[in-house]
């Protein structure tokens, strides 16, 4: 694994036992502002890093889950945090699974949000194709960028999510704030299984799934329990893939229960 990168960390407030949130692909700590504050109000010190190649954190070519986890381990060591309640959504959930296998001493409790320890085939490729096809030099405004994305990304909410990664440099030129090239090249790895057969963490574990999402299927339960024998699976029926947005109150309850 490449040397760990120093992650930018957003402190979302609170005092008490530390709870660390790992965001998903094309996300950042900003996505967790509201849910993080809600968790902090329940008596936790909540921290959310920008993972490598995302948000304001440094870029690196290695997007393996071992590398993502090692960055977070270095952050926990630097801040003298641990054992923590580790919460990971989607890609961040896979990074969290990898971390508990590599450094079980740093995690008191694991919450994995709407992702299973397996490979996924078809996800997000359309979004990356749309980002890669967008000629930033021809973009006149954020609205213009959204209209250009609409040709490939039909869902308004997904276009808005992609556009959270579009910024302007000092000269006012549009640029991606994510390392689009490294993430595109690493999609097979990001979509892959973060765990190897036989890896087990027997700490307290909860998998949260959105009732309207198909990321965690009933047939994934056996695989989940093979790696995490103490895991339970809680479904938030009103939510899709992003329960921290779509069902925040239920998400906070299920995360802390």
Segments the model singles out, each with a brief description of its role:
Residues 1-20, 41-44, 81-83, 171, ...:
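Alpha/beta-hydrolase fold catalytic core
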Residues 97-102, 106-141:
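Flexible "cap/lid" loop of the alpha/beta hydrolase fold
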Residues 170-227, 232-235:
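Conserved serine/cysteine hydrolase catalytic core
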Residues 67-84:
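Conserved acidic catalytic loop of the alpha/beta-hydrolase fold
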Residues 236-252:
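Catalytic histidine-centered segment of alpha/beta-hydrolase-like enzymes
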Residues 8-58, 206:
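Conserved HGGG/HGGXW glycine-rich cap/lid loop of the alpha/beta-hydrolase fold
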Residues 122, 137-192:
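Conserved alpha/beta-hydrolase catalytic His-Asp/Glu region
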Residues 88-92, 96:
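Gly/Ala-rich beta-loop-alpha elbow adjacent to hydrolase catalytic centers
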């Amino acid at each position: 694994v490449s040397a760990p990168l120093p992650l930018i960390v957003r402190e979302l407030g609170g005092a008490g036992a530390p709870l660390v949130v790992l965001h998903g692909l094309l996300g950042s700590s900003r996505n967790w502002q509201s849910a993080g504050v809600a968790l902090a109000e329940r008596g936790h010190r909540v921290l959310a890093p920008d993972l490598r190649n995302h948000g304001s954190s440094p870029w690196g070519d290695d997007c393996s889950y071992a590398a993502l986890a090692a960055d977070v381990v270095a952050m926990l060591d630097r801040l003298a945090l641990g054992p923590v309640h580790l919460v990971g959504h989607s890609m961040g959930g896979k990074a969290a699974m990898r971390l508990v296998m590599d450094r079980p001493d740093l995690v008191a409790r694991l919450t994995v949000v709407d992702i299973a320890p397996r490979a996924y085939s078809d996800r997000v490729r359309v979004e990356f194709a749309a980002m890669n096809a967008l000629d930033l030099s021809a973009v006149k405004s954020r609205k213009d960028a959204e209209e250009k994305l609409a040709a490939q990304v039909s869902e308004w909410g997904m276009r808005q999510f992609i556009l959270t990664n579009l910024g302007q440099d000092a000269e006012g030129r549009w640029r991606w704030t994510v390392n689009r090239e490294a993430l595109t090249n690493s999609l097979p790895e990001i979509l892959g299984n973060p765990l190897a057969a036989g890896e087990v963490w027997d700490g307290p574990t909860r998998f949260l799934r959105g009732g309207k999402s198909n990321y965690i299927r009933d047939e994934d339960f056996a695989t989940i329990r093979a790696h995490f024998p103490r895991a339970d699976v809680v479904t938030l029926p009103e939510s899709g893939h992003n329960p921290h947005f779509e069902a925040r109150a239920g998400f906070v309850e299920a995360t802390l229960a």
